[in-house]
């Protein structure tokens, strides 16, 4: 039997080839080299308030559900819709044509933690037959915090009596990601650094938030192959906000800045394109986002798409 020995040069070549292959795989993560293609017209705006922000979308069976922040009279400049602060929802048979359904999460009663406004609903997570929807809330005496509501049908929601469950400074824009039996709740913290806490059951969360070293608001996290990709919003939601992309191969390792997310900006989003959600729809990623072109007087929901690379088919 012959024994072959690898020279140092050959070993170096193999190592470099492996590194190159890994980097090529990482590059295929959405938002790194691929460009999102946004439709030229919005797909939705609340018919009652002419205002829709922070969309979160889930498909169950043949129905799509969109939850969003509606009517925020506190918005700087006096804009913010026509009604009372709340989280509304709409449904769709195809993810494109939406029908308004009503209020999902109303503003809290006087003295409650969300009596000023509920906002930024996270995508509902199903556990043991119950959907959990985390969202941010605020009253006049406290900074933004995070609580949740539950539902069995995605239509009628009951607020958790122990809200808020996360209240360590500024806690906004929750996003929940499940990986290997652990729930990661990503959220914006004071200074706009994106951090996360973990939970085994969606109820009890780790006491000390972990920094991702990514900066922004309204974070979204998806796993594409072996790469975790985070999208974070940079700027102000009514004046020039955009998405920045970050990646990591391990959630225990800080995310690396991948540059500005590549997406065409339609006319209705010339002022700001941000705070959205991504779903996997057959062979495409669908990216729902909030958009404005008039300084925040009106927010609408847009949709961008991107074909999935062979890596994740």
Where are the language model's segments positioned?
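Carbohydrate-active catalytic/glycan-binding domains of CAZyme proteins
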Residues: 20-313
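Bacterial N-terminal signal peptides that target proteins for export
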Residues: 1-10
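Hydrophobic h-region of N-terminal signal peptides that target proteins for export
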Residues: 12-21
């Amino acid at each position: 039997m012959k024994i072959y020995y690898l020279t140092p040069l050959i070993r170096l070549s193999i190592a470099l080839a492996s590194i190159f292959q890994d980097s090529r795989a990482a590059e295929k993560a959405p938002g790194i080299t691929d460009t999102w293609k946004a439709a030229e017209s919005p797909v939705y705006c609340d018919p009652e308030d002419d205002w829709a922000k922070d969309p979160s979308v889930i498909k169950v069976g043949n129905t799509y559900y969109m939850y969003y922040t509606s009517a925020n009279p506190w918005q700087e400049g006096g804009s913010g819709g026509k009604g009372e602060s709340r989280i509304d929802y709409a449904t769709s048979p195809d993810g494109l044509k939406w029908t308004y359904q009503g209020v999902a999460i109303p503003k809290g009663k006087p003295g409650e933690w969300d009596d000023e406004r509920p906002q930024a609903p996270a995508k509902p997570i199903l556990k043991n037959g119950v959907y959990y929807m985390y969202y941010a809330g605020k009253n006049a005496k406290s900074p933004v915090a995070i609580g949740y509501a539950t539902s069995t049908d995605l239509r009628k929601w009951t607020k958790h009596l122990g809200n808020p469950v996360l209240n360590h400074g500024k806690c906004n824009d929750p996003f929940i990601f499940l990986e290997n039996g652990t729930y990661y709740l990503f959220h914006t913290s004071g200074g706009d650094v994106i951090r996360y806490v973990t939970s085994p059951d969606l109820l009890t969360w780790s006491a000390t938030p972990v920094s991702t070293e990514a900066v922004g608001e309204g974070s979204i996290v998806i796993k594409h192959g072996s790469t975790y990709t985070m999208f974070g919003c940079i700027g102000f939601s009514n004046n020039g906000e955009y998405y920045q992309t970050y990646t990591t191969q391990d959630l225990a390792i800080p995310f690396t800045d991948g540059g500005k997310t590549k997406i065409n900006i339609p006319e209705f989003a010339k002022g700001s394109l941000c705070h959205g959600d991504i779903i996997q729809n057959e062979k495409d990623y669908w990216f729902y986002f909030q958009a404005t072109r008039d300084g925040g007087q009106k927010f609408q929901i847009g949709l961008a798409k991107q074909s999935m690379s062979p890596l994740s088919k």
